[in-house]
Amino acid sequence: MEFILSLVGSLLLIICVLVSVAFLTLLERKVLGYIQIRKGPNKVGLMGIPQPFCDAIKLFTKEQTYPLLSNYLSYYISPIFSLFLSLFVWMCMPFFVKLYSFNLGGLFFLCCMSLGVYTVMVAGWSSNSNYALLGGLRAVAQTISYEVSLALIGFKILLFSLL
């Protein structure tokens, strides 16, 4: 019974995160529209509120294309794996209802964030294009350098909170 409750809680958390990201994207588009002295997305429904759902339907109905010489399976699995890794990060966040209790939640956060680097590298490699591979390696180098500074800042905060 406890497993089912944690599974339902996890699914509810994932759905809430995805819907909130969709509406934050709508907010960003509205703000950018008002900055550029236009209304932003307002054609769908009342003031464009259902726009993220229409964008999702449009995205899922588009034709799937892939490079001819690419590794088909890893080309499509790496972005899906990256999405799952970013959703796993939300599992260690402390909420009012404890879904999972981690003693080392910060370490789990850093591990999930550092595993996302490999998905970018695999996505660049699996297209079998030298330019995509170089772009993926450049993104990996940038991400690793940002992760080092993020870890140092986190350890500094942890050190000062213990003093």
From Swiss-Prot:
EC number: 7.1.1.2
Subcellular location: Mitochondrion inner membrane
Alphabetized UniProt keyword annotations: Electron transport, Membrane, Mitochondrion, Mitochondrion inner membrane, NAD, Respiratory chain, Translocase, Transmembrane, Transmembrane helix, Transport, Ubiquinone
Protein name in UniProt: NADH-ubiquinone oxidoreductase chain 1
One annotated GO biological process: aerobic respiration
A Pfam family that the UniProt record links to this protein: NADHdh
Known role: Core subunit of the mitochondrial membrane respiratory chain NADH dehydrogenase (Complex I) that is believed to belong to the minimal assembly required for catalysis. Complex I functions in the transfer of electrons from NADH to the respiratory chain. The immediate electron acceptor for the enzyme is believed to be ubiquinone.
Cysteines joined through disulfide linkages: none
Keyword presence, Phosphoprotein: no
Membrane topology, from the record: Multi-pass membrane protein
Chain ranges passing through the membrane: 3-23, 77-97, 104-124, 143-163
